[in-house]
Amino acid sequence: MRLPAVVLLAAISTALAGGVTVKTLVSPTETSNSYVEMVPVKPRTLRAFTLCMRVASKLKGEREVNLFAYRTRDSDELKVRRELDGRLSFYLSGVPALFEVPPLGALETHLCITCDSKSGAATLFMDGSKSMTKIYKKGHALRSGGRVIIRQGPDPHLGKFDAKQSFVGEMHDVNMWDSVLSASTIRDIYSGDRGPRGNVFRLIHRRAQSHRSSGHRPPHPPPSSSPSSSP
């Protein structure tokens, strides 16, 4: 009989009532009912952001992989994923920005995405190296009042998680900022130098919730309060 899949919050994780202090998220198997959820440090509407994480995955071949999803009650505001053809992408409420980069693998990769609403400039960094800049969703803003789901991506049509798109591997140092970090700052973070902590989300320094959903239904954030603009 196959044992149920579990999300392991490992690497010197400390159990706490109602949550865990997360160092590394270890996802050993495909699953449609396990995920990690984070709430923002301070809810805010984002007109610019930087999202970084360290990822290692044993998944190969033609397979979609959900890495990160920021979801409000009404929509998926931001999704980061690996596409079937191996390209990395992020979605802002719709059509993706696609980046042709070396594939993710068992060796740890430092991955960062930056996006500026005013100019529309969107960039991906992999291990400190910068991609070509794309112009994407100029004028678009991420709404406040949502939550982050890691290792899963709710299907807007089926209303549940798909095990065949779940993340399998290790992830840590998930941080998000309300500004576009400079290329030199991102390279410093990749190199392990002390850099700014994420002021929107930070998995390694915050308490995060690990869940198993018996009904396989994705979570819905509570109704959002009045949004406030980021500085």
Q: Which sequence ranges carry the predicted segments?
A:
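Extracellular glycan-associated modules
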Residues: 2-231
